[in-house]
C-alpha cells in the first residue's frame, strides 16, 4: 500500500518508486 502513502504524501513519492 506504499503507493497509497505516496499519493497522500508528495514527499514520500520518492520512496514510492520502489
Swiss-Prot record:
Induction: Expressed in the late phase of the viral replicative cycle. Keywords: Capsid protein, Cytoplasmic inwards viral transport, Host nucleus, Host-virus interaction, Late protein, Microtubular inwards viral transport, Phosphoprotein, T=25 icosahedral capsid protein, Virion, Virus entry into host cell. It is found in: Virion; Host nucleus. InterPro entries: Adenovirus_Pll_hexon_sub3. One of its GO terms (biological process) is microtubule-dependent intracellular transport of viral material towards nucleus. GO terms for cellular component: host cell; host cell nucleus; T=25 icosahedral viral capsid. The modification Phosphotyrosine is found at residue 6. The keyword Phosphoprotein applies. All late proteins expressed from the major late promoter are produced by alternative splicing and alternative polyadenylation of the same gene giving rise to non-overlapping ORFs. A leader sequence is present in the N-terminus of all these mRNAs and is recognized by the viral shutoff protein to provide expression although conventional translation via ribosome scanning from the cap has been shut off in the host cell. Major capsid protein that self-associates to form 240 hexon trimers, each in the shape of a hexagon, building most of the pseudo T=25 capsid. Assembled into trimeric units with the help of the chaperone shutoff protein. Transported by pre-protein VI to the nucleus where it associates with other structural proteins to form an empty capsid. Might be involved, through its interaction with host dyneins, in the intracellular microtubule-dependent transport of incoming viral capsid to the nucleus. Homotrimer. Interacts with the capsid vertex protein; this interaction binds the peripentonal hexons to the neighboring penton base. Interacts with the hexon-linking protein; this interaction tethers the hexons surrounding the penton to those situated in the central plate of the facet. Interacts with the hexon-interlacing protein; this interaction lashes the hexons together. Interacts with host dyneins DYNC1LI1 and DYNC1I2; this interaction might be involved in intracellular microtubule-dependent transport of incoming viral capsid. Belongs to the adenoviridae hexon protein family. This is Hexon protein.
Amino acid at each position: 500500500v506504499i503507493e497509497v502513502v505516496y499519493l497522500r504524501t508528495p514527499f514520500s513519492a520518492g520512496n514510492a518508486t520502489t
